[in-house]
Amino acid sequence: MSTRPVEGSAIWDVLSPHSPHAAAADGKTLVWVEAGELCGHDTAESANLARIRPGLLAAFCHPKATEDDLTLITKWMAWLFLLDDRIDESDLGRDADLLDGHLQDLQGVALGIRTASGPMSRALEEIITQASAGMGDAWQLRFRRNISDYLLACVWQAAHRQAGEFPDPEVFPHWRRAFGAIMPSFDLIERTDGGALPSCVYYSRPYQSLLTAAADLVCWTNDLMTVDKEAAHGDLHNLVLVTEHDRHQDRRTASAAVSAACEQRMRAHTSARRDLTGLTAALGLPDTVRTHADDCAASLLVWVRGHLEWGLETPRYRPGTTGTGTD
């Protein structure tokens, strides 16, 4: 089990409910993975996916989701785990041009300009189609764009690995959110929690601040949990390692700095949520929209806390394990 990060943080005061559909979502997703030949004949890869339980992560992060929506989100998370591991643990993750070519089919599907031609792209096409059902055009375009940004960020990460460079600490948080696939994952909160937010809310300064604060919390607490594993793997794309290198600090001091940054993001989320309440009132939005906006703001922190709970349980974050390895 991973060491509990940010001990004493206000994030531990956030309730962490759990969907009752986790096991069902895991089971249906594993059947889907096999039927779609996402793992081919790689039994170790499919066994690893079963072991890390994407359905449990979905259940922690989306406790209000219906069983169908939770299964959809579990498929999305399983798809991400498979792609991330294939990139990170092969030459793809260290050759930006090779990876860029490899991802063209997925990019075309994400942007709606290409028909899927392989198992992973067909799976992505299905996920996008199912996620888009009942959602408006603006949400659908945003979801596609955010997936495309994630794929582009994987190439950025590969270019830095290829050069053996530590990321610039000033721009790293932006790219960390992107290659963590946080924004398309957060888009799904609107699907499970009542529908797409109007653009005047979603693109407002308060809601964008809420998204950024919550996304940073997911990424940075993840980095605190995984720093030893990633350091052993030679992966520099971890905020603790970036801080350690940039400030010439030891691991403990750098970890403390990242923990302090997490607390700052918690305060930023609290402030932005208060500002969002004021904005939706000033705009004269219907009570249903104002309540939905506040519910989505609260659900962002539930997502952060849910990811933490799963991270403490999953073997995925333990030092000495790989995507297809054993505990």
Curated annotation (Swiss-Prot):
Q: Please indicate if the UniProt record lists Lyase as a keyword.
A: yes
Chain sites annotated for binding Mg(2+): D84, D85, N222, T226, E230
Its Gene Ontology molecular function terms?
Answer: metal ion binding; terpene synthase activity
> What keyword terms does UniProt attach to this protein?
Lyase, Magnesium, Metal-binding, Plasmid
Report whether NADP shows up as a keyword of the record.
no
Q: Which domain of life is it from?
A: Bacteria
Q: Which reaction does it catalyse?
A: (2E,6E)-farnesyl diphosphate = (-)-delta-cadinene + diphosphate
Q: Which InterPro entries match?
A: Isoprenoid_synthase_dom_sf, Terpene_cyclase-like_2
The catalytic activity of this protein is classed by the Enzyme Commission as 4.2.3.97
Q: What class of enzyme is it?
A: lyase
Q: Which portions of this protein are annotated as coiled-coil regions?
A: none
Name the family. Answer: Belongs to the terpene synthase family.
As for what it does, the entry says: Catalyzes the conversion of (2E,6E)-farnesyl diphosphate into (-)-delta-cadinene. Cyclization mechanism involves an intermediate nerolidyl diphosphate leading to a helminthogermacradienyl cation.
What is the protein's name according to its record? (-)-delta-cadinene synthase
In its UniProt entry, the species of origin is given as Streptomyces clavuligerus
Which lineage ranks, top first, belong to the organism behind this chain? Bacteria, Bacillati, Actinomycetota, Actinomycetes, Kitasatosporales
